[in-house]
Amino acid sequence: SKKLKVLMSGGGTGGHIFPAVAIAQEIQKRFPDAEFLFMGANGKMEMEKVPQAGFKIEGLNIAGFDRGNLLANVNLPFKVISSLLKARKIIKEFQPDFAVGTGGFASGPALFIAARMGIPTFIQEQNSLPGKTNIFNAKKAKKVFTAYPNMEKFFHGTKTLFLGNPIRKNIITDIIDSDINKEKLGLEKGKLTILSVGG
């Protein structure tokens, strides 16, 4: 039988990368023979984090719009064109069954080209205020999975499905083994532990 092939794209920050990894891990759990290919931005953290999670990644020479330094955007149109062409070549060779985008500028060309090539695309939005890339790609997406309810106004209504944020398997394991983790931190087992984060 034919192997399931999945294209994943998202990056720039951990907020885009780690949900993509979590989705890939869950698909892998359900379809152990599935093949994955991530598409990210060269020089960004996904180029390191995705291989660490055990997945293959291809880099695009893409960057976001720099609002602070307008001169830095001079090469942006060329970067977009070269990224679209490279994304097309990668997708043509890999031939995914579907593509999942989690936002960040790298997922723009990847999902745009996938949709143009007739490949079903899906979006996962982690934020209550969606990013521009996900809003743009949602127009052609089959479904948009959101972390928060009532996101229809951003994503053409019927396309949205509120599922919450995906969590990586090592995080779930750490939560289940909370007593072991308390021991590592020198805390007492069985006692309620509160973590306070600010800043």
Task: Name each model feature, range by range.
Residues H16-I27:
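Short amphipathic alpha-helix
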Residues S1-L4, I176-I194:
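Nucleotide-sugar donor-binding and catalytic loop/hinge architecture
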Residues V6-G11, R30-K79, L84:
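Conserved nucleotide-sugar phosphate-binding/catalytic loop shared by glycosyltransferases and other
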Residues K86-A99, S107-F122, I135-K143:
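Glycosyltransferases and closely related glycan-assembly transferases
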Residues G11, A41-G43, I62, Q126, ...:
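Cofactor-binding loop segments of dinucleotide-utilizing enzymes, especially the Rossmann-like FAD-
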Residues A115-D179:
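Active-site-proximal region of nucleotide-activated glycan assembly enzymes
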